[in-house]
């Protein structure tokens, strides 16, 4: 829309502006907000192995995990014309969701016992699994999504921004 083009040449959201800074892309926005306004409790300390893993999750969400899920959605609109692509897309979905499912085995959150910004960045991936009706195949992902959706801050954000299709169904 023209309003967003006035803020950034790509005219896309999300976008955050603050002073001279204009930041696009969820991962970059999360990083910016935490560095400028965070209390230090949503990311591990920099220059640690945990921070490296955390950074991986910030980039993995949109760099790898979302692609097969989005392709599944788009190719589904092609009907029979998209049928030849489904096996490869399904293979990639299984590969990525299997990876996340395994990481979450025995953990409450991606980085361990505590919620981090990595969970926030990956939240849409988890929620879309439910929207696609796949929680039965990925119980650790389903439990993780329920945990973060049950958090008071998540509920407060929904109350402020309004419900959306991927949100809790209670």
Residue ranges and their predicted role:
Residues 1, 33-34, 147, 165-167:
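Short secondary-structure boundary/hinge segments and terminal tails
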Residues 19, 123, 160:
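Conserved residues at the C-terminal ends of beta-strands
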Residues 1-91, 101:
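GST-like domain detector, emphasizing the conserved glutathione-binding G-site
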Residues 6, 150, 159-160:
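Phosphate-coordinating loops and pocket residues in cytosolic domains that bind phosphorylated ligands
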Residues 154-170:
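Terminal-tail/helix-coil boundary detector
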Residues 58-152:
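GST-like fold's C-terminal all-alpha helical module
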Residues 34, 125-126, 158:
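Active-site-flanking alpha-helical
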């Amino acid at each position: 829309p023209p309003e967003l083009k006035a803020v950034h040449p790509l005219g896309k959201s999300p976008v955050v502006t603050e002073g001279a800074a204009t930041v696009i892309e969820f991962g970059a926005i999360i990083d910016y907000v935490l560095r400028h306004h965070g209390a230090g409790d949503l990311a591990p300390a920099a220059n640690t192995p945990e921070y490296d893993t955390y950074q991986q999750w910030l980039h993995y969400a949109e760099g790898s995990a979302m692609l097969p899920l989005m392709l599944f959605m788009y190719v589904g609109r092609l009907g029979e014309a998209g049928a030849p692509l489904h096996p490869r897309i399904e293979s990639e979905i299984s590969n990525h969701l299997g990876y996340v499912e395994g990481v979450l085995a025995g953990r409450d959150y991606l980085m361990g016992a505590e919620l981090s910004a990595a969970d926030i960045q990956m939240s849409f991936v988890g929620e879309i699994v439910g929207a696609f009706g796949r929680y039965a195949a990925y119980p650790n992902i389903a439990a993780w999504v329920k945990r973060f959706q049950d958090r008071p801050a998540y509920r407060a954000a929904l109350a402020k921004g309004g419900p959306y299709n991927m949100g809790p169904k209670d």
